[in-house]
């Protein structure tokens, strides 16, 4: 096992990365190794997808499957070894079908890629794990060095984050052939074990630029189906009655669940990154979408244990449900998996609803505590002139984009302290689950404009980018000249690709934490600092002083 993709990876003087019987996320060495094997199979599939496009062959089954299966290897998504192998088998079957299509056009069709003809050696998980050793990401570290390995992983993990957003968009009916062609090209190239530093750096920026387009179609999918988010108050306390909790990012799953629970007497609560769903008109119209439950994903083993109903996980993040003994009432959907947990293959939630009706639910309603969400792209752009006016009248000094992933590391209290230290004449724009560090606190307003503005999920960084570009255009300056600072927390691969997106768009002087990614060496961090001004957090006082004086 070698895995260094998330923020909680093991760090030692000898090197970074989880390489024992189990990773810090709870992923076993077996599952981790089989995910490496799956990635190799997907790289071979992409190699043939690139070749097929040369012949004008575009196989939509391949295009939809590839990023979805890649998404299953993202942190805290799928811990179920047999399902990972199932994805690998499906990848090979699709590859062979695509290969046959190519050969039907050109009998001499060939692909020069080491993954292009990969076959699984056995049905036995142990033998497959041994085969997977050929594809361990750091297998040639001694030959290429830590810097090249780090850049490879930056590209691989960034592309994995983009693949997750591609799947979220595809679920909502969004498909862009150019994006998929670019995805396959990059995925196939990474399967050749590239070792050119400049080419890898260029690739990382290409992934960021591609992901901006992915976020654009995801935004179109969400707003096209569910309307543009508008500011909405959400109760974060319990309402009496039977209940279901839904977590993850998949708004379509939430919509289907709301439709199927309507009139059943079962209330629905959002968790984690589902919180922004309350801002969408076509979702909040369901009166039994009663509120948001819990805090950051890392607290779920305590909070889920206390929730008196079933739980549905639609995407990341799931962690071991046996710890809180709620594994008999947590359900996985789509690419999510945990051994022994019931999985919903389709969009029928009747079994979950039946379980909710058999459980006690919340016995009484607590005193409501309301927070505000729903500052989507349209709302943010509508406020652009107000922001400019407040800045011109010196009522608004600075905007801090304070968001990203949450996690368990104690140093993450930095983000709570930072939020509460932001001066009263400054505004906080937040997104993603890092907001749970401070989103239930009171921040007041500036002439009626809330000082805490929740823009949505991690992918809604797109809205923040569009706002920044709009403000810069209206003020006749560059984005980096705005009174705007980005202080971002990271945990997994979606955060990595958001960072690459920002860097590829030329955004500079981003501050990140709580730690630097374990796969980035001091040399690589120095390069990123020199090129983009990217740096790690220090202390709240020092960072605040520096950002306000910039």
UniProtKB/Swiss-Prot annotation:
Natural source organism: Escherichia coli O139:H28 (strain E24377A / ETEC)
Family, similarity comment: Belongs to the HCP family.
A Gene Ontology cellular-component term: cytoplasm
Cofactor: [2Fe-2S] cluster; hybrid [4Fe-2O-2S] cluster
GO MF assignments: 2 iron, 2 sulfur cluster binding; hydroxylamine reductase activity; metal ion binding; peroxidase activity
Catalytic reaction equation(s): A + NH4(+) + H2O = hydroxylamine + AH2 + H(+)
Gene: hcp
InterPro entries assigned: HCP/CODH (IPR004137), Hydroxylam_reduct (IPR010048), Prismane-like_a/b-sand (IPR016099), Prismane-like_sf (IPR011254), Prismane_a-bundle (IPR016100)
Family matches, as Gene3D superfamilies: 1.20.1270.20, 3.40.50.2030
GO annotation (BP), single: response to hydrogen peroxide
EC number: 1.7.99.1
Pfam family, one: Prismane
Enzyme class: oxidoreductase
Subcellular location: Cytoplasm
Taxonomic superkingdom: Bacteria
Modified residues (Cysteine persulfide): 405
Protein name: Hydroxylamine reductase
Disulfide feature: none
UniProt: hybrid [4Fe-2O-2S] cluster binding residues: 249, 273, 317, 405, 433, 458, 492, 494
Annotated cofactor note: Binds 1 [2Fe-2S] cluster.
Binding-site residues for [2Fe-2S] cluster, renumbered to this chain: 3, 6, 18, 25
Annotated function: Catalyzes the reduction of hydroxylamine to form NH(3) and H(2)O.
Keywords for the protein's UniProt record, in alphabetical order: 2Fe-2S, Cytoplasm, Iron, Iron-sulfur, Metal-binding, Oxidoreductase
């Amino acid at each position: 096992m070698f895995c260094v993709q998330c923020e909680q990876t093991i760090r030692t003087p000898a090197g970074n990365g989880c390489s024992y019987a189990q990773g810090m996320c709870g992923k076993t060495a077996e599952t981790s190794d089989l995910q490496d094997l799956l990635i190799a199979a997907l790289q071979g599939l992409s190699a043939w997808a690139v070749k097929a496009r040369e012949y004008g062959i575009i196989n939509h089954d391949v295009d939809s499957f590839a990023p979805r299966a890649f998404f299953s290897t993202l942190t805290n998504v799928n811990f179920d070894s047999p399902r990972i192998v199932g994805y690998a088998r499906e990848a090979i079957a699709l590859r062979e079908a695509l290969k046959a299509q190519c050969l039907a056009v050109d009998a001499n069709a060939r692909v020069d890629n080491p993954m292009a003809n990969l076959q699984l050696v056995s049905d036995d998980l142990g033998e497959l794990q041994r085969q997977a050793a050929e594809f361990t990401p750091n297998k040639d570290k001694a030959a290429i060095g830590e810097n090249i390995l780090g850049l490879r992983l930056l590209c691989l993990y960034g592309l994995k984050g983009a693949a997750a957003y591609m799947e979220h968009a595809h679920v909502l009916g969004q498909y862009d052939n150019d994006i998929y062609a670019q995805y396959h090209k990059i995925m196939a190239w990474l399967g050749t074990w590239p070792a050119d530093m400049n080419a890898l750096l260029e690739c990382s920026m290409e992934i960021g630029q591609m992901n901006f387009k992915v976020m654009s179609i995801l935004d179109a999918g969400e707003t096209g189906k569910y309307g543009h988010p508008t500011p909405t108050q959400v109760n974060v306390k319990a309402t009496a009655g039977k209940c279901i909790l839904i977590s993850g990012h998949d708004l379509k799953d939430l919509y289907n669940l709301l439709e199927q629970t309507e009139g059943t007497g079962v209330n629905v609560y959002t968790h984690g990154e589902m919180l922004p769903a309350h801002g969408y008109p076509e979702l909040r119209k369901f009166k039994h979408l009663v509120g948001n439950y819990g805090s950051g994903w890392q607290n779920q083993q305590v909070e889920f244990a206390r929730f008196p109903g079933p739980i549905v996980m639609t995407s990341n993040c799931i962690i071991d449900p046996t710890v809180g003994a709620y594994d008999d009432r947590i359900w996985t959907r789509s690419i999510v998996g945990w051994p022994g947990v019931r999985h919903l293959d389709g969009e029928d939630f009747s079994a979950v609803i039946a379980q909710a009706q058999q459980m006690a639910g919340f016995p009484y309603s607590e005193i409501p505590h309301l927070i505000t969400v729903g500052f989507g792209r349209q709302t943010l752009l509508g406020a652009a002139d107000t922001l400019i006016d407040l800045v011109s009248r010196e009522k608004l000094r600075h905007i801090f984009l304070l968001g990203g992933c949450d996690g368990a590391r104690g140093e993450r209290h930095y983000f709570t302290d930072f939020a509460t230290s932001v001066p009263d004449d400054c505004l906080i724009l937040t997104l993603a689950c890092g907001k749970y560090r401070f989103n239930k606190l009171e921040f007041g307003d500036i002439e009626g404009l809330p000082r805490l503005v929740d823009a949505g999920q991690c992918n809604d960084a797109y809205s923040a980018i569009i706002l920044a570009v709009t403000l810069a255009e209206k003020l006749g300056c560059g984005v980096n000249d705005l009174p705007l600072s980005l202080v971002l927390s990271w945990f997994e691969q979606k955060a990595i690709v958001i960072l690459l997106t920002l860097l590829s768009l030329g955004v500079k002087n981003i501050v990140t934490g709580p730690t630097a990614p374990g796969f980035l060496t001091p040399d690589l961090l120095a390069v990123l600092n020199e090129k983009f001004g990217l740096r790690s957090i220090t202390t709240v006082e020092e960072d605040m002083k520096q950002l306000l004086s910039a």
